[in-house]
Design a protein with these regions (language model features):
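Cytoplasmic C-terminal tails of single-pass
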Residues: 290-302
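Periplasmic binding protein-like
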Residues: 91, 110-163, 199
Length: 302
């Protein structure tokens, strides 16, 4: 437990979001994202095993505290006190390419802060899925898009009976805690209310303490839309938003006419510029013509 807490402290998701997401996201404090019933903002919602509340904001606990946790469980300076061997962990990933290499290097750097060695193992998707089913994957990175906006659809990912290795469920970490499982069964079909919220609070507290996940981040995306587009509420859960959107064609046409009025200034400037370039040539041509006519007339007189 202390080892997992130390890893959670070391993996600085605020830095990850800043580097790889250009700041578009917030570090997760629990399995529940903002907007889902049971999510708590502010000091009430932070993971107190990973963060301190400082000046009105969550602040990740220092690396030295994570190292202290490792010493308490027998890994001083990342060395197994019993065998004398360095603590080495393995991260399985299916990502390839330059960005994947950058992310792998970043994870390696995070664990190096607490003197833990990380070996990144690239693998194909089928082999990766086999490792999850067999329970042989040690560290991995997964995300989740909910099927519906209810805390049950997030908490079930940690429900013991739905273990990937033992029951072919979605609990890929194979986490099992009897109290959590019992509370999940109570909570899953309850109506939202004080009793359900109390149960959810306790479930989150258990998961934060046990740290089966090093919580990642909740993505934040930005969308731009014209004023004539209505019923637009982008989210990361639904993929059928278009059926609800409405276009105001009259407003669209009015805006197009306002924004696309003819602008004659540049055209007039271009015409004047062209005339300015042609005028000297035309004057020179007229002079040559007059001279030619004068010469021709003098020849006829003689």
């Amino acid at each position: 437990m202390a080892l997992r807490q130390a890893l959670s402290i070391a993996i600085d998701m605020e830095e990850f979001v800043s580097i790889f997401r250009n700041g578009r996201g917030i570090a997760a404090q629990s399995p529940l994202p903002p907007g889902i019933y049971g999510y708590r903002d502010g000091e009430a919602g932070i993971d107190h095993y990973v963060y301190d509340w400082v000046d009105g904001h969550p602040q990740r606990k220092p690396v030295e505290y994570a190292k202290q946790l490792l010493r308490e469980v027998g890994y001083p300076n990342g060395i197994d006190a019993t065998t004398g061997k360095p603590l080495t962990l393995y991260l399985d990933t299916t990502l390839v390419g330059p960005e994947a290499k950058s992310r792998a290097d970043w994870f390696t750097k995070q664990l190096r802060k607490i003197d833990v060695q990380l070996v990144v193992r690239a693998t194909d998707l089928n082999r990766f899925q086999d490792k999850l089913r067999d329970g042989t994957a040690q560290l991995y990175v997964l995300g989740w898009n909910a099927d519906y906006p209810d805390p049950e659809n997030f908490m079930f990912l940690l429900h013991g009976p739905q273990s990937r290795a033992r029951g072919a469920g979605e609990n890929a970490s194979n986490y099992a805690n009897p109290e959590f499982d019992r509370l999940f069964e109570q909570m899953r079909n309850m109506e939202n209310g004080p009793q359900r919220l109390q149960i959810i609070d306790r479930m989150i507290e258990i998961v934060q303490r046990d740290a089966p996940w090093a919580f990642g981040f909740h993505p934040a995306d930005y969308n731009l839309a014209h004023g004539w587009v209505h019923n637009l509420k982008p989210n990361t859960m639904a993929n059928n938003e278009l059926k609800y959107e409405r276009i105001d064609p009259l407003l669209r046409e009015r805006r197009r006419n306002e924004w696309n009025k003819p602008v004659y200034g540049p055209l007039l400037a271009l015409v004047l510029l062209g005339l300015g370039a042609i005028a000297p040539a035309w004057v020179a041509w007229r002079r040559r013509e007059r001279h030619r006519v004068a010469v021709q007339q003098d020849g006829n007189k003689s």
